[in-house]
Design a protein with these regions (language model features):
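Charged docking surfaces used in two-component/phosphorelay signaling
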Residues: 17-25
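Acidic catalytic/metal-coordinating carboxylates
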Residues: 35-38, 61-64
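Short hydrophobic/Thr-rich beta-strand motif most characteristic of the beta2 strand and flanking loop
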Residues: 27-34, 42
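Active-site beta3 strand of CheY-like receiver
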Residues: 46-52
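Conserved phosphotransfer cores of two-component systems
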Residues: 44-46, 68-75
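Receiver (REC) domain active-site loop signature in two-component systems and cognate sites
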Residues: 57
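Conserved acidic carboxylate
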Residues: 10
Length: 86
């Protein structure tokens, strides 16, 4: 079975490592970025199968990053993460 490539964009390093370690034990190849600007660059370089993004990050938040991605890529599934309570 072919591994699924995931781009994880998360500014909290500890959380990013927990998620990465959990998913790498499954059928995923995980690439990480620390903020929306880095995530945007890596997305277009890697063309991952799935994008997992934090909502609130420095330099560019997850919503803005996905808005820019959606200008040219409307197919890649996106999962948003947030630590904010409702």
């Amino acid at each position: 079975m072919e591994k699924i490539t995931v781009l994880l964009v998360e500014d909290e390093q500890t959380l990013a490592m927990i998620i990465k370690d959990t998913l790498e034990g499954q059928n995923f190849i995980i690439h990480t970025a620390a903020d929306g600007e880095e995530g945007l660059r890596k997305f277009f370089d890697l063309r991952p199968d799935v994008l997992v993004a934090d909502v609130m990050m420095p330099r560019m938040d997850g919503f803005e990053m996905v808005r820019r991605i959606r200008q040219t890529d409307k197919q890649t599934p996106v999962l948003f993460l947030t630590a904010r309570s409702a």
